[in-house]
């Protein structure tokens, strides 16, 4: 059993792996890269170079194959350290090919592209593109069938559409249980949905607070569910908390809330393409996610939603369709009647019956290209690599802390859970007061791209699709110099 494989096994058991005394060397990092069976996927992506990050105008130069190999001596060829896939994934090389095919199709056959495709194109006819992307996303989120997935809109729009169907407050049950720090757009959606129903957010929102380490335990969540078992209508949590990187126990929390009559939805913005999901088997009522982070669909790319099959049924036994209430539109109509222009809405069975408008074929093209890369591997294999990559990152960060002078306040602490099964790829570093600007400037100057959350948090995400153990080692050299300088 290789060093890499043994670490995967240990981490999947929820344990911390042992690293050798030479772990903090380039040679050891490269040895892990050599054992990585997914390392070739890096060549599927365009990694910005140190030179390209400094661009001020278009010049027709796209960072290419040189930016994906080993480091060379010039900024023009040296790939940056791209640890920000939790904010925007790197561009798959397939995107340019797919977009060029789409533009040629539109130019060549015009409106016929809705129903026809060119024989050597990687794309389906436009009317089938959303369903095709849903089919390619089903395994990523653990749907039992592609019919449980719909690709449409963007995340917050989908959150509104799902809440229109699943948040049905009554005088008795009207509260929404949330975590302490939802992403602001989610928070705005929750507030506005409550107000839309004529309710007061102050009375209808239950906010769960974390402990002093910013950790929200499963026990605290279950206790809150019990406390509001009679008046909560909806539990809506992130699968991974965007600020701390904590991964919640989705199956346990879902089951517990549903047993008390509470509908359960999940915002999986930081889960989809990052951790293994089994939404159907976990009996999740609904979920939403974006595709521009770990799924690499491009800035603002089309988002996804999951609706469990039990909520997507269309009953025709009474001669007219009976289905779960929703905000309806023509593109949610069954394809067999979609172009009949009838007044009676007959939805497509499943999640795709929640569509409203004709989706952008251009946006779907970018996502289709990104998903074509995902479909060459599995979430199990990606998660296995991510576990080791993040554990190695954690180990080297701990070594930096151990090297600090005795008695000196640590320059940072990791606020992401140390349990590998309670986090994804991201590690959030809470910097000592006064360090953020200096560290951020040093990282930028040395070609490191990661996410900064003021006042003091840096989110580091070495995603497994295109990041290397060598990148982690190089990041540590730059980061330690920055906090010491």
Curated annotation (Swiss-Prot):
> NCBIfam families under this entry?
kynureninase (TIGR01814)
Gene, per the UniProt record: kyn-1
Entry function: Catalyzes the cleavage of L-kynurenine (L-Kyn) and L-3-hydroxykynurenine (L-3OHKyn) into anthranilic acid (AA) and 3-hydroxyanthranilic acid (3-OHAA), respectively.
Instruction: State the needed cofactors, names only.
Output: pyridoxal 5'-phosphate
Summarize where pyridoxal 5'-phosphate binds, as residue positions: 155-156, 183-186, 267, 270, 292, 330, 358
Q: Which Pfam families match?
A: KYNU_C
Looking at the UniProt entry, the stretches that span the membrane are: none
- Protein origin, superkingdom: Eukaryota
Any idea what this protein is called? Kynureninase 1
Q: What Gene Ontology biological process does one annotation of this record name? A: 'de novo' NAD biosynthetic process from L-tryptophan
Which E.C. number(s) belong to this protein?
Answer: 3.7.1.3
Which compartments is it annotated to reside in? Cytoplasm
Q: Which GO cellular component terms are attached?
A: cytoplasm
EC supergroup of this enzyme:
hydrolase
Catalytic activity entry: L-kynurenine + H2O = anthranilate + L-alanine + H(+); 3-hydroxy-L-kynurenine + H2O = 3-hydroxyanthranilate + L-alanine + H(+)
**Which family, according to the similarity comment?**
Belongs to the kynureninase family.
- Please describe the quaternary structure of this protein: Homodimer.
Q: Under the GO molecular function aspect, what terms does this record hold?
A: kynureninase activity; pyridoxal phosphate binding
User: Could you tell me which cysteines form disulfide bridges?
Assistant: none
């Amino acid at each position: 059993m290789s060093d890499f494989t043994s670490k995967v096994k240990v981490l999947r058991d929820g344990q911390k792996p042992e690293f050798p005394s030479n772990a903090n060397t380039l040679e050891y990092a490269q040895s892990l890269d050599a054992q990585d069976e997914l390392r070739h996927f890096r060549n599927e992506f365009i990694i910005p170079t140190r030179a390209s990050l400094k661009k001020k105008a278009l010049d027709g130069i796209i960072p290419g194959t040189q930016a994906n190999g080993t480091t060379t001596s010039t900024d023009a060829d040296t790939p940056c350290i791209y640890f920000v896939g939790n904010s925007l994934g790197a561009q798959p090389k397939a995107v340019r090919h797919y977009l060029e095919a789409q533009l040629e199709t539109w130019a060549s056959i015009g409106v016929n592209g809705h129903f026809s495709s060119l024989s050597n194109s990687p794309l389906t006819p436009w009317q089938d593109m959303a369903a095709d992307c849903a089919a390619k996303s089903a395994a990523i989120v653990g749907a039992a069938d592609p019919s449980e997935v719909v690709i449409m809109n963007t995340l917050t729009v989908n959150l509104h559409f799902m809440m229109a169907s699943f948040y049905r407050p009554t005088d008795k049950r009207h509260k929404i249980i949330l975590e302490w720090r939802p992403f602001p757009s989610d928070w705005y959606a929750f507030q506005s949905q409550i107000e839309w129903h004529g309710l007061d957010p102050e009375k209808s929102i239950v906010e769960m607070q974390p402990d002093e380490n910013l950790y929200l335990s499963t026990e605290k969540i279950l206790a809150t569910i019990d406390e509001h078992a009679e008046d909560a209508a909806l539990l809506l949590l992130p699968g991974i908390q965007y600020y701390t990187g904590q991964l919640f126990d989705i199956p346990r929390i879902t089951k517990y809330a549903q047993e008390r009559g509470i509908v359960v939805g999940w915002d999986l913005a930081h889960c989809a393409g990052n951790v293994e999901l089994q939404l159907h088997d976990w009996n999740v009522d609904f979920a939403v996610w974006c595709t521009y982070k770990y799924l690499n669909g491009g800035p603002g790319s089309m988002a996804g939603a999951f609706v469990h099959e039990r909520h997507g049924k269309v009953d025709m036994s009474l001669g007219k369709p009976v289905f779960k209430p929703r905000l309806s539109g023509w593109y949610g109509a069954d394809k067999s009647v979609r172009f009949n222009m009838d007044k009676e809405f007959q939805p497509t069975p499943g999640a795709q019956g929640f569509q409203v408008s004709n989706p952008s074929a251009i946006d779907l093209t970018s996502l289709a290209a990104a998903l074509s890369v995902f479909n060459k591997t599995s979430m199990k294999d990606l998660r296995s690599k991510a576990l080791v990559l993040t554990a190695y990152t954690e180990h080297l960060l701990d070594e930096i802390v151990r090297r600090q002078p005795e008695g000196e306040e640590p320059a940072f602490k990791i606020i992401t859970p140390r349990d590998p099964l309670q986090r994804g790829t991201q590690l959030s570093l809470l910097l000592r007061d006064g360090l953020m600007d200096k560290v951020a400037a040093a990282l930028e100057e040395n070609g490191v791209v990661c996410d900064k959350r003021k006042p003091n948090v840096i989110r580091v995400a070495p995603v497994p699709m295109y990041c290397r153990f060598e990148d982690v080692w190089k990041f540590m050299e730059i980061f330690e110099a920055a906090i010491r300088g």
